[in-house]
Amino acid sequence: MAKLIVSDLDVKDKKVLIRVDFNVPIKDGVIGDDNRIVAALPTIQYVIDHGGKAILLSHLGRVKTEEDKAKLTLKPVAERLSELLKKPVTFVPATRGKELEDAINKMNDGDVLVMENTRFEDLDGKKESGNDPELGKYWASLGDLFVNDAFGTAHRSHASNVGIASNMKQTAAGFLMEKEIKFLGDAVDNPKHPFIAILGGAKVSDKIGVIENLVPKADKILIGGGMTYTFYAAKGMSIGKSLVEKDKIELAKKIMDQAGDKLLLPVDSVVATEFSNDAPHKVVDGDIPDGYMALDIGPKTIKEFKDALQGAKTVVWNGPMGVFEMSNYAEGTLEVGRALGDLKDATTIIGGGDSTAAAKQLGIAPKITHISTGGGASLEYLEGKTLPGIAAISDK
C-alpha cells in the first residue's frame, strides 16, 4: 500500500518531528561508523530546505542503568550531524520538560534540533520501548507533523514511532524508509525472475520465517552458515561438532520437502577442530568428520552458488556463509559478495551486519542496488510480516 512520503507534506513554517535511526556504534564518545547518520541526511535536508524546523528523535543502544546514560548520549551524534549538514545543530540533553520545549519554541525555519536518546525514558518503566501512551502523546504535542525515517526500528512498536504517529493527523515516511519499502517490498511481492535468495547465519530459527515466505516466490534459495548443519542433521548426515539446533530438525525436514530442488545446501565445508582461526582446518565433502566443526562453505559450494547466481534478475542476501570475522573462514562470504558485485542487470539487496560488512570490505557496496539499514526489520519484512512502524504511517 502506498504511504505518504515527506515530499507529499507542506513542511514550511512547521515543526517536523523526524524519527531517525542514529543507533550508531560509539566508543569513548567517538562514532565508529556514521552510515546511519548519513542515510538520514536526505530527509533532514528536505525538511530544512523547504522551510521546516527539524526536531530529531532517535534511540541509541539499550539504556538499563543510570551509568549507561553517559555512554549513550546522542551529543556526539548531534556534533557529527552538524559537520555533515555544515550548519549548527542544537542538542538538548532532555527527552521532555521545559528545557526541551523552550529550545523547540526558539527554533527558526531551517533549524535542526536533536533531543536526547529516547531510551533514557526506559529507565523509569520502559516508557519508550513499551510504547507508553502518555509519552507518545507528549512527544506528538511538540510538533505539527511526524516523519518516520527509522526503518531499523519499524518492526518495533515504540513511543517514538507508533506512539507519536497515532497522535498525529498526518504522518509520512522519510526517503530512507521509502527506499527500504520499495526495494524489500518489490523483492517480496513482485520480484523479477530468476529470483535468488542467499541466506546464511548461525541459526535456522532466525531465518525460518524468511525461508517459508520465500519458498513459493524464489527460484533458488542458497543456504550457508551454521544453519546448514541443522539441515544436514535433518538429512541424516554426520555433522561432527558443528552447530545444530536439535529442536529445529523436524522443521528443517519440512522445509526441504516444501522447497524440493529450489533449496541448495553446501556440498563441501571448511572444517576445524576448534572454533578458532588458529586451529588446524581442511576442506571436506559432505559429512563432517567426528571431532571437527564446519566453519565455512567450501570451494565446490562457492562454485555451485556462483553458477546458481548467473543470470539472476533479483538477489536478496542476508547472513554470512561462515565465521566471517575469522580470516580462515571468511572466503565463502567474500566470494558470494564478489559474485553479487559482478552481476549485471540484477536488483541486488543486502541485509544484515556481516553481509553488509563483507560488501564494504570488498568495495562492492556502490555496485549493490540497496543495502538495508534494518537488521531485524528487514528480516521481518522478508518474512511477509506487517511492521508496526510502517503500518502507522498515513496512506496516500
Swiss-Prot record:
Binding site for substrate: 21-23, 36, 59-62, 119, 156
Pfam families: PGK
Chain sites annotated for binding ATP: 207, 325, 352-355
Pathway: Carbohydrate degradation; glycolysis; pyruvate from D-glyceraldehyde 3-phosphate: step 2/5
Alphabetized GO MF terms: ADP binding; ATP binding; phosphoglycerate kinase activity
Keyword Lipid metabolism: no
Cellular compartment(s): Cytoplasm
Keyword line: ATP-binding, Cytoplasm, Glycolysis, Kinase, Nucleotide-binding, Transferase
GO CC term (a single one): cytosol
Top-level taxon of origin: Bacteria
Enzyme Commission code: 2.7.2.3
Catalytic activity: (2R)-3-phosphoglycerate + ATP = (2R)-3-phospho-glyceroyl phosphate + ADP
GO BP term (any one): glycolytic process
EC class: transferase
CDD domains linked: Phosphoglycerate_kinase
Recorded family membership: Belongs to the phosphoglycerate kinase family.
Subunit structure: Monomer.
HAMAP family, per database record: Phosphoglyc_kinase
Name of the featured protein: Phosphoglycerate kinase
Native source organism of the sequence: Lacticaseibacillus paracasei (strain ATCC 334 / BCRC 17002 / CCUG 31169 / CIP 107868 / KCTC 3260 / NRRL B-441) (Lactobacillus paracasei)
